[in-house]
């Protein structure tokens, strides 16, 4: 049986697709990430006013489209008419995806378009709650086994864990991460029980180094994978792989794929 964790490690994640090279969280961005070697597509979801689960990072559409306002106040008909390539620019001057028909996709469309990829889905919206609606989309696409559900906020993650009953892999919310890093700092693991399947964190936060040899080793002892975001420099990718992380998320997934490939070749 194939699952979210079936592909070999280290895992190559396309962060919002190949968002350094194409409009984030769109089908062209995801397709480019796959072409560049990503086995995993990281994305974010919200709901429209009429309940469609759409792939979008922000609660508003202003930053990535030619529209404005909260996605929760737009119907799917209105959201799907927006130009999701309108704001993308690699150089700050040219906008190659404007007017090219790039649209905000529904989660169901991404699942259908990329049946061989694993999806890392962050549920951004807490109110009104959309966990059940996301699960319904996953069940309809028979994709529960190839996704990991993530959430930054503790209340959303609690809702996820309550709803899934162990059927879907999960990440760790802020509260989980704080508790884990505190354990690493104190080197006290008495009574610790992991709540998720993967610790997905940046290398550092608020001046505190999070990804260290100690935290990687502790994660592995606890049965957790450790995935690091969002890394867009080859030297930093190499450093993290040297530490033994299980996956790297990047806006430029080709950099991660190249580093992983070279390691496999060098090891025979």
List each language-model region with its residue ranges.
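Metal-dependent phosphodiesterase/phospholipase catalytic core, i.e.
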Residues: 3-4, 9-10, 57-167, 192-222
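Hydrophobic packing residues within well-ordered alpha-helices of enzyme cores
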Residues: 51, 134, 160, 240, ...
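Active-site beta-loop-alpha junctions enriched in small/polar residues
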Residues: 17, 46, 50, 58-59, ...
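Solvent-exposed polar/charged
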Residues: 35, 39, 112-113, 162, ...
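Active-site mouth loops of central-metabolism enzymes
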Residues: 14-24, 94-102, 171-179, 205, ...
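C-terminal active-site rim and adjoining tail of enzyme catalytic domains
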Residues: 174, 180-268
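Conserved N-terminal beta1-alpha1 strand-loop-helix module at the mouth
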Residues: 7-57, 62-67, 72, 78
């Amino acid at each position: 049986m194939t699952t979210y964790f079936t592909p070999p490690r280290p895992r190559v994640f396309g962060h919002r697709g190949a968002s350094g090279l194409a409009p984030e969280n769109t089908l062209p961005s995801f397709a480019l990430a796959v072409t560049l070697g990503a086995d995993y597509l990281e994305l974010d979801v919200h709901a429209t006013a009429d309940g469609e689960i759409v792939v979008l990072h922000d609660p508003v559409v202003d930053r990535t489209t030619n529209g404005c306002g909260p996605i929760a106040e737009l119907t799917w008909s209105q959201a799907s008419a927006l130009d999701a390539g309108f704001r993308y620019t690699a150089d700050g001057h040219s906008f190659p995806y404007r007017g090219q028909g790039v649209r905000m996709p529904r989660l169901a469309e991404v699942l259908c378009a990329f049946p061989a990829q694993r999806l890392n889905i962050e549920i951004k919206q807490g109110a009104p709650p959309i966990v059940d609606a996301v699960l319904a989309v996953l069940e309809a696409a028979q994709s529960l086994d190839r996704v990991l559900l993530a959430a930054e906020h503790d209340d959303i993650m609690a809702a996820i864990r309550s709803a899934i009953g162990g059927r879907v892999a999960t990440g760790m919310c802020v509260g989980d991460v704080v508790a884990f890093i505190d354990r690493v700092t104190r080197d006290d693991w008495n009574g610790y029980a992991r709540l998720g399947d993967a610790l997905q964190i940046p290398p550092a936060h608020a001046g505190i180094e999070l990804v260290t040899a100690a935290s990687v080793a502790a994660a592995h002892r606890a049965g957790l994978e450790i995935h690091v975001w969002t890394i867009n420099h080859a030297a930093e990718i190499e450093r993290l792989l040297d530490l033994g992380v299980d996956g790297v998320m990047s806006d430029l997934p080709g950099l991660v794929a190249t580093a992983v490939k070279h390691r496999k070749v060098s090891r025979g």
